[in-house]
């Protein structure tokens, strides 16, 4: 099945945002996509962050969906040094993936004062082509061989 064409999105002052969904696991994702269940999922706005090697979502989403946590924390090198943060498993759905979901490990962060719910890092971008047109005030994110 071919992925849908990648739409062009307008840039906003804080960067490229992309809408998606966070699902708890593969079975709930498939049940929702096959219209066999009303399992909980979270619609999200995610900032494309090419400088991050791992994606992250807000603590409130992790809590609301009761995402499974790994026993060992992730070590993230960011502003202020290296931090130890919770690492969780989820399924990320972006429209550019067609009907597929991406099993993903994410870190939980504090995005409550941001206009987005988390970030898309290079762990997701490795499956995508990201085109950033600053002068045109546009960006395109498309799935490649997904």
Residue ranges with predicted function:
Residues 1-146:
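Pepsin/retropepsin-fold aspartyl endopeptidases
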